[in-house]
Amino acid sequence: MKHIISPLDLSLSELSDVLNLAEKIIVDPKQYSECCQGKKLATLFYEPSTRTRLSFEAAMLNLGGSVLGFSSADSSSAAKGESVADTIRVISSYADICAMRHPKEGAPLVASTYSSIPVINAGDGGHNHPTQTLTDLLTIKNLKGRLDNLTIGFCGDLKFGRTVHSLINAMVRYEGIKFVLISPEELKIPAYLREEVLDRGNIPYEEVKNLEAVMPELDILYMTRVQKERFFNEEDYIRLKDSFILDAKKMEGAKEDMLVLHPLPRVNEIATEIDNDPRAVYFKQAEFGVYARMALIMLLLNVVPQE
């Protein structure tokens, strides 16, 4: 049995399996509509979510399975003090696979040690978000045609942005990748990521504070919001929330085939005037999240149809 707590829990070969299957689903989703008949997905969401929770539910329903779970800690026995370990022990007897989101880093890892069913990390604090990474990789692969030889800019909250941390961990395994890290000083990527992943792996990167200046070199621009829920001091949030805003003027300097990604939700970091630019693919990215999760669920449950 395999748990997906980090993108690194999938080898490059396994990543390829997920992405290739997801692309087949994009072409003909109805072919897989009965793969999970009789199977149940438990969604244990201790933290608010729109896209991740609903796309997991849509994925399982599209596969012919069913879903049970909760959408906030307050609506579960966590509000009474029940531990993650006890919760997952019980849920393991109710479902065949589990997706967990939790505000505490490492909670899904704890759950996996007590679970008798596969656990998928649907986001743990500011740490990891592996299924968003699969969504991002699928979007890039499908729309750019490759996952190597890319210059990728990450802009905004790189300190608390778990989607950024996960995608960096995944992309460093491909050839010819360069990162441009665009953030205010207070929201730079964590030191462990810089030292243990980028520096140790000799991955080329630059840290800058001016988005417009680096736009011409980017193949991918990954925008993020400044996350109010990660700040202890509201004054710091207010001071930093408008640090980087992507608008039509900044897009003038970008390549014609650059892609703008965003894990969503956005607040004001991408002007709505960008939405109709063909390079803005964040809504397509959200759609691809369903297909990526369908593929992962099928592979973890070993229900992929034989060709």
From Swiss-Prot:
This protein's UniProt keywords: Pyrimidine biosynthesis, Transferase
Residues at which carbamoyl phosphate binds: R51, T52, R101, H129, Q132, L264, P265
E.C. number: 2.1.3.2
Molecular function per GO: amino acid binding; aspartate carbamoyltransferase activity
Catalytic activity: carbamoyl phosphate + L-aspartate = N-carbamoyl-L-aspartate + phosphate + H(+)
Known pathway: Pyrimidine metabolism; UMP biosynthesis via de novo pathway; (S)-dihydroorotate from bicarbonate: step 2/3
Residues given in the record as L-aspartate binding sites: K80, R162, R225
GO BP terms: 'de novo' pyrimidine nucleobase biosynthetic process; 'de novo' UMP biosynthetic process; amino acid metabolic process
InterPro entries reported for this sequence: Asp/Orn_carbamoyltranf_P-bd, Asp/Orn_carbamoylTrfase, Asp/Orn_carbamoylTrfase_sf, Asp_carbamoyltransf, Asp_carbamoyltransf_Asp/Orn-bd
Keyword Transferase: yes
Family: Belongs to the aspartate/ornithine carbamoyltransferase superfamily. ATCase family.
Subunit details: Heterododecamer (2C3:3R2) of six catalytic PyrB chains organized as two trimers (C3), and six regulatory PyrI chains organized as three dimers (R2).
Main function: Catalyzes the condensation of carbamoyl phosphate and aspartate to form carbamoyl aspartate and inorganic phosphate, the committed step in the de novo pyrimidine nucleotide biosynthesis pathway.
Protein name per its UniProtKB record: Aspartate carbamoyltransferase catalytic subunit
Organism of derivation: Lachnoclostridium phytofermentans (strain ATCC 700394 / DSM 18823 / ISDg)
Gene (name only): pyrB
